[in-house]
């Protein structure tokens, strides 16, 4: 069914909550493992209608945050979502209390029961009101960000539409673009500072209600991290700071030499080449035709997937006023349909987001069609889900010429370099959030000072050159994840470590790399992060020294492929 034909009906929350009670009672009383497994499939499907309605509302709202009808529907789900989540937790409690619960591990692997335990430990009826308040705060942030229009070049532009100006070869144009963006954020400084302070206090309060020291501790449960915790994440960040950052300084020196910008300021960093950054082919249809060819030639599975996506209007990727910034993939379970949202701005990032979100959507498409996989185990933890997307960016490389033509080699260098350099920024965001939630009484200026300290630790090559907003250490406020989904961002780093390994494998044997990727995808949410890496024969990045060799290989490749 085409997206435009999908009908929306606000769900009956009372009926759903009553169904949840009935399912919980049956789960507690299930007489044997076989009955419990059957019931698990049933409860998983019970939320399909609600989740479909919720995602339809969110898609329409984020496509136009000014639409009063969809704003009201988004408010409805913000208000009722916590009660539904907690009703789901009650079902998990009932499964866990059943003496035959081990049957679920036998049927579905290690993540099912561990995930239910995390759900139970991370939610409680006592936090419903706080969760509702948090949802409302996030919606306010989305309105501030999504409503951004700035004046530049005689035009009213959204934040994503500033992208091409930030990459312009004229340094004055780049600076003007950053200053226009900075002006908007500075104008909303008090509001953004207050919103973040309220979010930190809210989530820390939720953590205390549930018996945790602060939200940084609770986040490991809420993010459903299975088999590792804060100790392993710190070890990972330390490796990046000690083993990767020195190599990144070498990489950034290569970039400066390549561009001829001897002492690059922050506003110079988006320029990757003397003659300008690679540009994808123009036009929505031309790009979509290229994507169809690319995925048809990659594999039979991706051919079927891309036809389904394009034939059913499951892309909304062009930027326009009122549309929320960023990109995402979500699922509409009643239709077994992924949906991709993005904001193209005629930079190479348009191809990044296309291949990235198609990686998420491809995994969702495959999992939704596997009868063995229950609906709520279709997707693994976020650190694993991001492997699907980030690896797809690299595994489509043999077809990037369809989207870049003569700029293909430039894009290969830009994309690979950016992915490698990203590790430092991702760890910076994660450490910053740990500091914020462990020190909730920091003033806005103190928060910004902490960010600037971390900039020196993880990205010592940056010179803000008195740039407004960024120069005072507030640049983190334009990172959606810090407000919307705290502690998610490190997942991109963990998945990048897998994606870089897929990239290195593909250099010598693309077919083998793709087959490993497909094995990983087909395990859906039935395996943990470390188990998925083992499935694909990849290194786990928590052990000391595990990153260094990969980082050196990446640096060597970049040095050999300077354009």
Question: Where does each model-flagged region fall?
Answer:
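Glycine- and acidic
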Residues: 122-123, 179-188, 228-234, 269-280, ...
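Active-site recognition of the HExxH zinc-binding catalytic motif
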Residues: 342-368, 389-390, 394, 432, ...
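Inter-helical turn/loop segments and adjacent helix faces that build the functional surface
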Residues: 230-231, 254, 258, 298-301, ...
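Post-HExxH zinc-binding segment in Zn-dependent metallohydrolases
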Residues: 242-243, 368, 379-407, 415-416, ...
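Auxiliary, metal-adjacent structural segments of Zn-dependent hydrolase domains
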Residues: 274-334, 347-348
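A well-structured
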Residues: 1-278
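C-terminal, non-catalytic "cap/extension" segments appended to globular domains
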Residues: 110, 115-117, 227, 354, ...
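Long, well-ordered alpha-helical segments
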Residues: 196-213, 217, 251-255, 359-369, ...
């Amino acid at each position: 069914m085409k997206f435009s034909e999908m009908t929306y009906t606000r769900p009956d929350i009372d009926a759903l909550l009553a169904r949840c009670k009935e399912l919980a009672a049956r789960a507690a009383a299930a007489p044997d493992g076989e009955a419990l497994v059957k019931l698990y499939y049933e409860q998983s499907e019970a939320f399909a209608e609600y989740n479909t309605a919720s995602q339809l509302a969110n898609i329409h709202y984020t496509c136009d945050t000014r639409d009063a009808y969809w704003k009201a529907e988004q408010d409805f789900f913000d208000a009722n979502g916590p009660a539904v989540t907690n009703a789901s937790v009650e079902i998990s409690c009932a499964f866990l209390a059943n003496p035959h619960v081990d049957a679920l591990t036998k049927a579905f692997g290690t993540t099912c029961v561990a995930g239910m335990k995390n759900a139970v430990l991370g939610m409680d009826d006592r936090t419903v009101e706080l969760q509702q308040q948090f949802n409302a705060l996030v919606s306010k942030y989305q309105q501030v960000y999504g409503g951004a229009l700035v004046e530049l070049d005689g035009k009213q532009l959204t934040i994503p539409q500033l992208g091409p100006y930030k990459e312009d070869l004229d340094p004055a144009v780049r600076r003007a673009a950053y200053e226009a963006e900075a002006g908007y954020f500075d104008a909303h400084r008090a509001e953004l500072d207050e919103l973040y302070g309220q979010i930190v206090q809210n989530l820390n309060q939720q953590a205390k209600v549930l018996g945790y020291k602060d939200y940084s501790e609770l986040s490991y449960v809420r993010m459903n991290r299975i088999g590792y915790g804060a100790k392993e994440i710190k070890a990972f960040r330390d490796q990046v700071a000690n083993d990767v950052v020195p190599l990144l300084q070498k990489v950034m020196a290569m970039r400066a030499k390549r561009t001829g910008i001897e002492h690059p300021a922050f506003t110079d960093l988006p320029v990757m080449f003397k003659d300008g950054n690679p540009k994808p082919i123009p036009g929505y249809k031309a790009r979509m035709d290229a994507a169809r060819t690319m995925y048809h030639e990659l594999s039979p599975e991706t051919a079927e997937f891309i036809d389904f996506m394009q034939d059913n209007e499951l892309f909304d990727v062009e930027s326009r006023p009122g549309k929320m910034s960023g990109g995402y993939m979500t699922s509409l379970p009643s239709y077994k349909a992924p949906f991709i949202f993005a904001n193209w701005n005629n930079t190479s990032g348009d191809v990044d987001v296309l291949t990235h979100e198609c990686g998420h959507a491809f995994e969702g498409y495959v999992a939704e069609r596997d009868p063995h996989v229950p609906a709520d185990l279709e997707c693994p933890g976020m650190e694993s889900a991001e492997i699907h997307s980030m690896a797809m960016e690299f595994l489509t490389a043999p077809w990037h010429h369809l989207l870049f033509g003569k700029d293909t080699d430039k894009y290969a260098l830009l994309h690979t370099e950016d992915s490698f350099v990203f590790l430092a920024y991702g760890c910076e965001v994660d450490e910053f959030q740990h500091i914020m939630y462990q020190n909730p009484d920091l003033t806005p200026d103190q928060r910004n000072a902490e960010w600037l300290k971390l900039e020196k630790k993880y990205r010592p090559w940056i010179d803000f050159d008195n740039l407004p907003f960024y120069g005072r250490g507030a640049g983190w406020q334009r990172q959606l994840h810090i407000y919307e989904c705290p502690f998610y961002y490190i997942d991109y780093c963990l998945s990048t470590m897998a994606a870089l390994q897929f990239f290195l494998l593909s250099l010598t044997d693309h077919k083998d790399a793709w087959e490993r990727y497909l094995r990983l995808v087909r395990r859906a949410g039935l395996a943990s992060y470390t188990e998925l890496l083992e499935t694909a024969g990849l290194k786990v990045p928590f052990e000391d020294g595990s990153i260094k060799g990969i980082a050196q290989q990446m640096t060597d490749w970049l040095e050999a492929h300077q354009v």
